Structure formats: structure tokens, C-alpha cells
Amino acid sequence: MKKRQLGNSDLFVTQMGLGCMSLGTSETEAMRIIDEAIDLGINFFDTADLYDYGLNEEFVGKALKGKRDQIVLTTKVGNRWTEEKNGWSWDPSKNYIKAEVKESLRRLQTDYIDLYQLHGGTIEDPIDETIEAFEELKKEGIIRHYGISSIRPNVIREYAKRSNIVSVLMEYSLLNRRPEEWFPLLSEQQISIIARGPLAKGILTDNNARKIERVKEKNYLSYSYDELYATLANVKEIIGESSLTGTAIQYCLHNETVAAVIPGASSIQQLQENVQASKQKKLTTAEYIQLQQIAKCDTYALHR
């Protein structure tokens, strides 16, 4: 599988990684999916301390044991579970980040993290203190690089200006083009986008009938059911016999500001289908422009 450089770092990630949030709570099934992902050539695995109270990190750690040097491992920090585990609070403080990284290392059974990401953030945060925590962890060799997982324009702008982040993880797909607003700035700063949700919750897949029906009850982002139906009909007219899943993935990867897409997978079959779709030929410039002309290009209205 082809790789791309993550920002200006020394990390090279496969164009398709595995978003591990969808692995579930069955250790056996989670391990099987991760093992299959490695066998299929994936080297990029994204988890978080928040997922299933840390259980997700434990599964990833067990599955990657003995294969650590083959893998680019990323996890996230900033959300603190309550003692009752019935909710969480936001904590971007230096003390919390430097304490919680030790817990992630323990669960992941590793002594370093390739990419440590702030899992959210607001403009009211003590941003300089947060950056200082990540920079100290880099100097200590506990993390190799750091990034943020955020959709907030004001937060992205501040970290791009004030820190050494190498990536911004955000939801991005043909139906959610809001991150494209940030392509020029992030490209100029040599900061990559990691795209989660490239298949738009299954709407941009070849088996999407049930997913589309759900939009009748509740819109998808700013798309009404009728708008979505018409947009997908136009997409299919452009791509002909090509896979919709593959087209969705190639759309995200067309601009190389995007280092990788990280769709989730809750089964081996789903993983295999995604990897197969990722092998579809690249979109031509003409196809890319045509797709852009028929899909909305909204921007984030809040947190400017």
C-alpha cells in the first residue's frame, strides 16, 4: 500500500489507516481485524484513551505486540472519564496530559507513541501550556510527534501558528467538504490532514441503501434526503461503473494535504472491502472538479 509523509515529520503512513474506534468490545474480533489490517498492508492505527474506557487501546496494544516497529501508532488525550464512567470532562492541562500518556503507554504496551493528538480543544484552553506538555514529551522521547483532532477554525489556526503540530485529524468526505477551507494554510505550514469518516457513515459506499433511508428521518449535515439522493445520482453518473466506495476514498486522497483516510471497520469483511476500494485508480483532475461541482462546499459557521 502506498505511503505518504505525515506533515514535515519522519513518519510515513499508508494512505489508508484503520480508525480503531469501531472495533467494539470483543477482544477476539478486534485482534482479528487488526491482524488482517496488517496483513493487508496497513501500517497506520488510530485509537484514543477515550474509546471504551481505554479498552480500545488495550486491544490495539495486544494486537501490535511484536510488530511495533512496523507500525505508526497514534492515540489521543484530553478527555477525562468521571469515576463512575458515565461521562467525561475536558482537561488539556499539562499535568493531565503528562500523567495520562503514561496510562496510554501501559495500555498500548509500548514505550513511545508515534503521534500523540489532542482530542478536541477550545480557544479558551491554556494553549501554550498544552503545547509545552507535548514539546516536553517529545524531548523525553515518549512521543515522536504531535497533532490535534479538531474541527474548530479558531483552534486549528492557533495551533498551526503557535505549535509544531504535524497533523490535524478531522471528518472529511465528498459530502463534508468543510476541511477544504484549510488546505492552503495547512499545506503551506506542512501540516497534514488525517481524514476520518471518508465514507460519510456508510452513505458513500456501494451498499448504502439502508444508510440513505435513515436520512429521511434526520438530515445528513446540511443535506436533506432529496438533496442527498440527487447528489448521489449525479455522482453515479460521473463515475459510471466505478465503485462509489473507491471514489469516495480517492476523492479524499486527491489533494495530498490529506496524508491518510482512516475509515473504521467492525468486521473483517468491511475492512477488506475498504482496502479493495482504496486500490481504485486515482481520480482525474476533470473527475475531481466534476465531483466538487455537484457536492456542497460548506464551511464551519461557529468558532471562527
Where are the regions a protein language model picked out?
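Beta/alpha (TIM)-barrel catalytic core signal, keyed to glycine-rich beta->alpha loops juxtaposed to Asp/Glu
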Residues: 121, 125-303
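Active-site groove signature of glycoside hydrolases
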Residues: 105-124
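A short acidic, helix-capping loop that chelates divalent metal ions and anchors anionic groups
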Residues: 80-87
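Short, well-ordered coil/turn segments that N-cap beta-strands
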Residues: 11-16, 41-44, 67-71, 110-114, ...
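Short, acidic/polar
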Residues: 25-37, 92-108, 150-158
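N-terminal binding-site loop/beta-alpha segment at the start of enzyme catalytic domains
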Residues: 1-71
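Alpha-helix N-cap and loop-to-helix initiation/capping positions
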Residues: 29-32, 59, 88-99, 125-129, ...
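Solvent-exposed, non-membrane alpha-helical residues enriched in polar/charged side chains
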Residues: 35, 61, 65, 98, ...
